[in-house]
C-alpha cells in the first residue's frame, strides 16, 4: 500500500470533525440555519471590479509552515483587510492543521461588509450548508479532494445556496475537471497538497488554457507587489494572500500596497 499523502491525512481528520459536528447539529438543523441566514453578497461583482483584486486571508497556521501568527481577534484583522481595500476576506476554518474554526468565520462575517470565503477541505454536503449558515458568500472546493461526480454535485449545491465556489486546481488535468464541472471561478494553487511542494510556474502554465469567461485567482506565493504584478502579467484577476499578510506586522498597509499595485494603470489587465 502506498503511503498516505498529506492531503489524505488532512481529509481523514476533516471527515472525523464533520461527523462530530453533525452529531451535535443535524443536517436538517444546519440546512434550516442556512435557509434563515441573510442572503449572500455578490461575489462575482466584487471579483469583476477593475484591477487585480486582493482576497485577504485569516490564517493562523499551515501544514507547511506551522504556526504563522497569533490572531487573538480575527474580526479586527478582517476589518484591517477591508480598510486596506481587500475585495474578499478568506477565513480558514480547518482546525487540526490550520488552527481555524467556524467561530473565526462568525467573527469575520459580523465585522465586515465585503464578501467572505470559507476556506476548508469540503468533503461532505453538510459543510456547504454549514458555510452558508455561518455567513459565507463563497466556498472553497478542492478538485484533488473530490471525485468528479462529487465535485459536480458539490458545485451545484454551493450555487443552489447562492454562494460562489472557488474551485482550486494545481495541474492542467485538474483545471480541465474544474471546467467540465462548470466552475465560474478557478483558483490555481502553486502548492501541491499531496506533497506540499511549491511550483511557482503553475499559474502561468495553467491560466492560458482557461476561457476568458472564467475568473482566475492565483493562490500561494504572494509576498509583495512584485508577485502580484507577475501573476497579473500571467492573467490573474485576483490573488489570494494569507501568510504574507498575517506575518507582515501591518496587515492593513500590506493589503493597501497590493491593492494600489493591482489598480495602478501600469498593472497588466486580464484578457476579457
Swiss-Prot record:
The keyword Methyltransferase does not apply. Gene3D superfamilies: Aldolase class I. Its EC number is 4.1.1.48. One of its GO terms (molecular function) is phosphoribosylanthranilate isomerase activity. Pfam families: IGPS (PF00218). GO terms for biological process: L-tryptophan biosynthetic process. The keyword Lyase applies. Pathway: Amino-acid biosynthesis; L-tryptophan biosynthesis; L-tryptophan from chorismate: step 4/5. Keywords: Amino-acid biosynthesis, Aromatic amino acid biosynthesis, Decarboxylase, Lyase, Tryptophan biosynthesis. It catalyses: 1-(2-carboxyphenylamino)-1-deoxy-D-ribulose 5-phosphate + H(+) = (1S,2R)-1-C-(indol-3-yl)glycerol 3-phosphate + CO2 + H2O. Belongs to the TrpC family. This is Indole-3-glycerol phosphate synthase. The gene is trpC.
